[in-house]
Amino acid sequence: MSKKLTFQEIILTLQQFWNDQGCMLMQAYDNEKGAGTMSPYTFLRAIGPEPWNAAYVEPSRRPADGRYGENPNRLYQHHQFQVVMKPSPSNIQELYLESLEKLGINPLEHDIRFVEDNWENPSTGSAGLGWEVWLDGMEITQFTYFQQVGGLATSPVTAEVTYGLERLASYIQEVDSVYDIEWADGVKYGEIFIQPEYEHSKYSFEISDQEMLLENFDKFEKEAGRALEEGLVHPAYDYVLKCSHTFNLLDARGAVSVTERAGYIARIRNLARVVAKTFVAERKRLGYPLLDEETRAKLLAEDAE
């Protein structure tokens, strides 16, 4: 490669590529979450019969992974580029390799391996067949074919491609520390993010009010339940995300025991499952608006029998 792509040029290249494959370009969802999978643009849209093709950048917060900005590769917050396609194209892996070529990575010149790594997210009742993608010995992407989301079987199957943008950029720019990544011409990643990394790490590990977080979890859980009683799927799911992030803060602080941890995860999972069922029922009531007319009529007729 002649000029190395900046972080934002990597994003722009991936956006253009997946736009050309028919994906809608969504924006990052405005609630804290631990992974792009937890965005409603993936979690909710992966279930039910309607087609869905979307791509978006998702900042992902993992309080327990914070290292005060001192670790070159471990972060409180990193960025994922998320692609979800339902139904899954038969050539999704070929499309992925083509996207790497657009980034200047020729698959014929590098050791690219798909390493089996089936995926599970216990807190949302989700699982699928998966592979890690390793580029010259470094994991850069997670591939998943969802089999279950929110405790519901997926049909049709959704394919998810999650690029780790920091790792990808480190490789492309040949730097050893994420903080040396060039975000834009003349601006390094560390100049933007190293201070927030330090502050969030200090807060997560030392400063956060455990009693407040415990109370907030209970309040968020209760409010999610109230929203669901009114059939309000999206506000309810916002509170599921708040429960998840609050739990992650408690976990980072060491405020929950091993047995309590399992209990909190089960509480989040139970809410997520009700949200998923309610969402599917809502889409059916609306007549599956994203389906083509013929498929919609056939499916609604089958449901009415």
Curated annotation (Swiss-Prot):
Entry keyword annotation includes Transferase: no
Gene Ontology biological process terms in this record: glycyl-tRNA aminoacylation
First-listed, main subcellular location of the protein, grouped into a coarse class: cytoplasm
Record field: catalytic activity: tRNA(Gly) + glycine + ATP = glycyl-tRNA(Gly) + AMP + diphosphate
Signal peptide, first to last residue: none
A GO CC term attached to the entry: cytosol
Pfam families: tRNA-synt_2e (PF02091)
A molecular function (GO) term: glycine-tRNA ligase activity
HAMAP family: Gly_tRNA_synth_alpha
Entries under NCBIfam families matching the protein: glyQ, PRK09348.1
Name this polypeptide is given: Glycine--tRNA ligase alpha subunit
Organism expressing this protein natively: Streptococcus pneumoniae serotype 19F (strain G54)
Gene designation per UniProt: glyQ
